[in-house]
């Protein structure tokens, strides 16, 4: 029996809306990364982008367990000497919660061309409102 290989023309893409208020950051990000890769479909093929579109709401209300909010640092470098900038996750979520959630999901995807294609299907919003009603997204509840 031959293995099934999905072709890009055959893929049906759905839109999902996920509310992450009160959900742990890592658990929500890993499930969303799995949906973006297409691992929830029977036609999953590792070298083809078979994933669906995901709209994430309430990114600022995501939960960090333990002391991570204060102790874990969000770092980036400006590429100038001495340009390492760092802030705690509590401050980062207060300032740019959508970017923090976006980065958590991006780091769980492959790091090549296919991963860059997959991350473009993720839309992250602060608050309850989004502007993708025209796509008729389905509400999806995360497992944990």
UniProtKB/Swiss-Prot annotation:
PANTHER family (UniProt xref): LARGE RIBOSOMAL SUBUNIT PROTEIN UL13M (PTHR11545:SF2), RIBOSOMAL PROTEIN L13 (PTHR11545)
Domain of life: Bacteria
Database matches in InterPro entries: Ribosomal_uL13, Ribosomal_uL13_bac-type, Ribosomal_uL13_CS, Ribosomal_uL13_sf
Keyword Ribosomal protein listed: yes
GO BP annotations, alphabetical order: negative regulation of translation; translation
GO molecular-function term, one example from the UniProt record: mRNA binding
Keywords assigned: Ribonucleoprotein, Ribosomal protein
Pfam families: Ribosomal_L13
Quaternary structure note: Part of the 50S ribosomal subunit.
Family matches, as SUPFAM superfamilies: Ribosomal protein L13 (SSF52161)
Protein name as it appears in the record: Large ribosomal subunit protein uL13
Function: This protein is one of the early assembly proteins of the 50S ribosomal subunit, although it is not seen to bind rRNA by itself. It is important during the early stages of 50S assembly.
One cellular-component annotation, GO: cytosolic large ribosomal subunit
Similarity-based family: Belongs to the universal ribosomal protein uL13 family.
């Amino acid at each position: 029996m031959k293995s099934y290989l999905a072709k890009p023309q055959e893929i049906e893409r759905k839109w999902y809306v996920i509310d992450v208020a009160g959900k742990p950051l890592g658990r929500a990000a890993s499930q969303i990364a799995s949906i973006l890769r297409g691992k929830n479909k029977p036609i999953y093929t590792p070298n083809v982008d078979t994933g669906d579109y995901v709209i994430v709401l309430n990114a600022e209300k995501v939960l960090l367990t333990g002391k991570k909010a204060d102790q874990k640092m969000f770092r980036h470098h400006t590429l100038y000497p001495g340009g390492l900038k760092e802030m705690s996750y509590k401050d980062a979520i207060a300032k740019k919660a959508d970017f923090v959630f976006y980065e958590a999901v991006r780091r769980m995807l492959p790091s090549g061309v296919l991963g860059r294609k997959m991350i473009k299907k993720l839309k992250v919003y602060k608050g309850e409102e989004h502007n993708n009603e025209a796509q008729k997204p389905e509400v999806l509840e995360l497992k944990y």
